Design a protein with these regions (language model features):
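ASCE RecA-like P-loop NTPase motor cores
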Residues: 1-404
């Protein structure tokens, strides 16, 4: 009995230590992480290699404590370990926990192989605010090639946005395919987009200007209250979304216009269904609303692109890929940031015209599309160059005459 009690006492700190190990994930967040990453949404930070040994050491302590607990129980006499006895139950429990924590230790050692240049390892926050360890490949081409392309004689790939330039074959290289393996066909749009889509760009504050969110909210308010057509605003961060939503809410409430704002982690489906009900509603979306949602006809008639969709450079995967490009003598902006922003831009624009009878307007609130040297690349992704206007009021006036 005394030995069993000692085993019980040995197991208690093991459980407490397990909780500490979970909390120790917090220490993997590097010192000096910018506060802007933390308020809400996708809170990401690259793993600090200096904290790895401490975390693995804590797991090792836990395993050794379990091993000591097992030795304590196994030292009991045979009667205490007979079938159905408390001693045997305690032994089985300790053995099970030891096996699970050995698996955890092995998984941690695999995920924390920071010398592996083909992956990005980082910690983020889950929905409950707890720390979560992640490991993502920098490139998926090899995985796709092994899992799909080498197993089939022929594979047909189709995409409306994958090839933003004339070099269609080059677009498949990130998928693990070589140019000489690909027969590429580029087909024109089945829709007369030049007639179906109006494109305007507002020459206002740039996204990094202090007054950008205020100007964006005011502009969306003008478009929504003037046109009274379902309006989707695509943003690139929840922080900006929240700021714009707070400024828009009183304006739209006074006009009787429904406002839907996507929350971090919120699925697009329920918001999309509510938005489709019409009524000239305004939907503020990010992430999942740039692709994969379908709003034909009057379900979406005005699309506002808040800013050109460049990825956040501090995103762990983006940062790791940028580091690799620099090491290989490339330019992260030219070789990564710009191509991926163009792809996301085309995906966002694709939310508007879904059938041959749709008609709608794209309003781009980021003046860099007209001012910057790379703006021409984004303009080429549109069916026609955008007309540059001085204000949202001018845009609304033009669109009032353009819509039937």
């Amino acid at each position: 009995a005394a030995a069993l009690a000692e085993a019980d006492r040995a197991l208690r700190p093991v459980l407490a230590h397990a909780t500490e190990v979970a909390r120790d994930l917090e220490t993997l967040l590097p010192p000096g992480t910018p506060a802007a990453l933390w308020p809400r949404g996708v809170d990401l930070a690259r793993v600090s290699p200096h904290a790895v040994d401490g975390c693995l050491g804590a797991i090792g302590d836990l395993i050794r404590a379990l091993e000591r607990a097992i030795e304590t129980v196994e030292a009991e006499d045979g009667a205490a370990l007979r079938p159905g006895s408390a001693g045997l139950d305690a032994l089985d429990e300790a053995r099970g926990r030891l096996a699970r924590w050995i698996e955890v230790d092995q998984a941690f050692r695999a995920v924390l192989r920071l010398e592996d240049r083909d992956v990005a390892t980082f910690v983020d926050r889950d929905e409950r605010g707890g720390a979560r360890l992640n490991r993502r490949p920098l490139e998926v081409g090899g995985l796709l090639r092994d899992a799909i392309f080498t197993l089939s004689e022929r594979t047909l790939l189709t995409s409306a946005t994958l090839a933003p330039t004339r070099d269609v074959a080059a677009a498949v290289e990130p998928l693990g395919l070589r140019k000489d393996e690909v027969e590429a066909v580029r087909l024109p749009s089945p829709f007369p987009l030049e007639r179906q889509m109006a494109t305007l760009a507002i020459d206002g504050p740039e996204p990094n200007d202090a007054g950008f969110a205020r100007a964006l909210a005011a502009g969306v308010g003008v478009l929504a209250t003037t046109l009274r057509r379902n309006t989707l605003v695509l943003l690139t961060s929840y922080q900006m979304l929240d700021d714009v939503a707070a400024r828009l809410k009183p304006v739209l409430e006074a006009a009787g216009i429904p406002l839907y704002a996507q929350a971090p982690g919120e699925a697009a489906g329920p918001l999309a269904r509510a938005f489709r009900s019409g009524g000239g509603a305004v939907l503020l979306g990010t992430a999942s609303f740039w692709e994969g949602v379908d709003f034909p006809g009057e379900a979406l008639e005005v699309l506002v692109i808040a800013r050109l969709p460049f990825a956040v450079p501090t995103d762990p995967v983006v940062a790791a890929r940028s580091e690799r490009i620099v090491e290989e003598g490339g330019d992260p902006f030219r070789d990564l940031a710009l191509p991926e922003a163009l792809l996301r831009f085309r995906q966002g624009i694709g939310r508007l015209i879904r059938t041959a009878t749709d008609k709608g307007a794209v309003v781009i609130a980021d003046p860099r599309i007209a001012r910057s040297w790379y703006g021409d690349r984004f303009r080429q992704a549109l069916p026609a160059p955008p007309r540059v206007v001085r204000s949202a009021e001018e845009a609304a006036h033009l669109l009032l005459r353009w819509f039937p």
